[in-house]
Amino acid sequence: MKVLLATALVSLLPFSSAVECSKNEILNKYRVNEFSIGGVSVQDTPPSETKESWWLNICDEHDSKSSIPDQCNVKDIFCGVTSVALPGKESIVTKVMDFTSSVALEVKETAEALSIRLSGAAWGSHILNADIYLQCQEKGSGSLTESSWTDDQNVKLVFSGPFGCLKKGNDNKDGNGDDDNNDKDGDDSDKKPHDGDKNGSKPKGGAGLGSWLVWLFMYATIFALIYLVVTSYMNTRNGSFNDFREEFVDRSTTFATNLPQFAKEVAGKIVNSGSSSQRGGYSAV
């Protein structure tokens, strides 16, 4: 009697045959727990027609048992049913593939779809694996777009529908955690510069003068070098390269030696010219 009572109580307890997607780091971001996922693929196998019906519900939060094929186990999270029909006759079920919650589950995010791999389902003496891809398509309730067997034990299925889309708040995130697709957070760094500050901080006047003097020095050096080369070549154009080199070295040495005195004379003339013009502004009484 106690055994029968315990069995009855256990049968009344709810069981969880799927994954709690809300606690899964990846599945929690997708709408996979909001929709029933299923599809049918039909293949001509003359004289018969082969049909594969697929059903998926990996989230415990969504109850889609009403859409599960009759041949599948109520504890399945993924199930496939193969049936064959001859013209004018009822279809015959030839294969039922049950993937219960005991199979290994691997979830990945790819650029094209949400990838779900189920492996280790027992089918007679064989082991079956399923690679399922959920692509995002906002409109409609979803459909099976691709179904293929890579070998006798591995099937690949591609579903397209809203279940493959990210939930609001998980797509188009920017660096501030909002959905406005920009990195502005309202602080002073986001304010546009005024018209006078478009180029940032302006360089000081001394920096502009220094740059001008550097360019002037570079041009003067280039012109002096050209002058020395041309003059040395003109004086030794009928001689050898050694003659040209000696002439160039001598002229360069002389130029470098006389340059300070030349610069001093130029500076003196500039200063004297300024003083003379200043004195010219006074008249004798």
UniProtKB/Swiss-Prot annotation:
One of its GO terms (biological process) is protein transport. Residues 19-209 are lumenal. Residues 168-204 are annotated as: Disordered. Disulfide bonds join C21-C59, C72-C79, C136-C165. The keyword Transmembrane helix applies. The keyword Chloroplast does not apply. Residues 19-167 form the MRH domain. Belongs to the ATG27 family. This is Autophagy-related protein 27. The lineage of its organism: Eukaryota, Fungi, Dikarya, Ascomycota, Saccharomycotina. The gene is ATG27.
